[in-house]
Amino acid sequence: MSYKIMAINAGSSSLKFQLLEMPQGDMLCQGLIERIGMADAQVTIKTHSQKWQETVPVADHRDAVTLLLEKLLGYQIINSLRDIDGVGHRVAHGGEFFKDSTLVTDETLAQIERLAELAPLHNPVNALGIHVFRQLLPDAPSVAVFDTAFHQTLDEPTYIYPLPWRYYAELGIRRYGFHGTSHKYVSGVLAEKLGVPLSALRVICCHLGNGSSICAIKNGRSVNTSMGFTPQSGVMMGTRSGDIDPSILPWIAQRESKTPQQLNQLLNNESGLLGVSGVSSDYRDVEQAANTGNRQAKLALTLFAERIRATIGSYIMQMGGLDALVFTGGVGENSARARSAVCHNLQFLGLAVDEEKNQRNATFIQTENALVKVAVINTNEELMIAQDVMRIALPATEGLCVPA
């Protein structure tokens, strides 16, 4: 028996969706509604054989969901709203409260809204998306899938910051980590491809894109991750600085009379590859500029790789070794240059890349005699969300639900 599961990622002015047939994992359609709240919202829906695009007024998220469901019916992707057996919602922050994906109830939704202080730009609109789908599809269970939940296995010395204790006890300031859905999915696929239980592996997963994070996974548990209290911390990213000396901020604020909001803008939107290269936040553009001799672009690419290498080294020490290094995300999946730079001169760890395999994006790119497997695995957060819906809302199907 198959089930139609919808995976939803609600943004402040957008709604990204995918409809999957489970447990096969087949994508039936995917799409995006952008510029919600505007008279010229953009609607894009794609199947394997067709693509529809139009510009229409979309007043709010309720309008967006209503429009989406109307289009699915109108394009005969579904015959009835009852065809949708469950809905999985990506939620940015689960705090310490949610340690796994969970079936949405009124109390669950209220708790997600209470956690908005930890993710003020994301949790409120995630909650709104859940609320609208529960209203319009009352017979389809909703499951909340948290970016932070996979990292709730971190040990206390790993997630506590060396600040006065009250900031953790009273305000919840600690390392939470993000990209958990991606890290969980990719590590599971890796174990399937190796034919080894994840519980027997030491894995470092590099999710590299405009937002990047590294995760150390030992015996199937996240034991460290580069993003912390916010997704701004960790390694260098497209427009985010990652970790820097915190005293730089008050120094800049005093010199340039910047407000906290302006400093946040600087760290989140003007730094990283964009800030150092002066070219772009897109790795491909920076790579192209570096190939033409742009010194700052070359420096940006070197910094990007070196921050990742330093993180990998510390995680290997923490886990007492490494069985597999995995690349995923837009850059990790598509840039042979980035993968090569990250793995450069790591032969002493038993880690070496075969450049011919690397250039053709093979699944495993390590040399024949390397001790550490090096894999390139496409992430699929939507499929992971759908699998969690199957596991939690339709538990009788759990045994059928495996990574594709």
From Swiss-Prot:
**Annotated pathway, please?**
Polyol metabolism; 1,2-propanediol degradation
Per UniProt, the keywords (alphabetical) are: ATP-binding, Cytoplasm, Kinase, Nucleotide-binding, Transferase
- Biological process GO terms, please? acetate metabolic process; propanediol catabolic process; propionate catabolic process
The record, for InterPro entries, names: Ac/propionate_kinase (IPR004372), Aliphatic_acid_kin_short-chain (IPR000890), Aliphatic_acid_kinase_CS (IPR023865), ATPase_NBD (IPR043129), Propionate_kinase_PduW (IPR024896)
Where does it primarily localize? Answer: cytoplasm
Protein origin, superkingdom? Bacteria
Q: Name one Pfam family in it.
A: Acetate_kinase
Any one GO molecular-function label of the UniProt entry: acetate kinase activity
Q: What does this protein do?
A: Works with phosphate acetyltransferase (pta) to capture exogenous propionate and regenerate propionyl-CoA during degradation of 1,2-propanediol (1,2-PD).
Annotated NCBIfam families? ackA, PRK12397.1
Stored PANTHER family: ACETATE KINASE, ACETATE KINASE-RELATED
Q: What is this protein called?
A: Propionate kinase
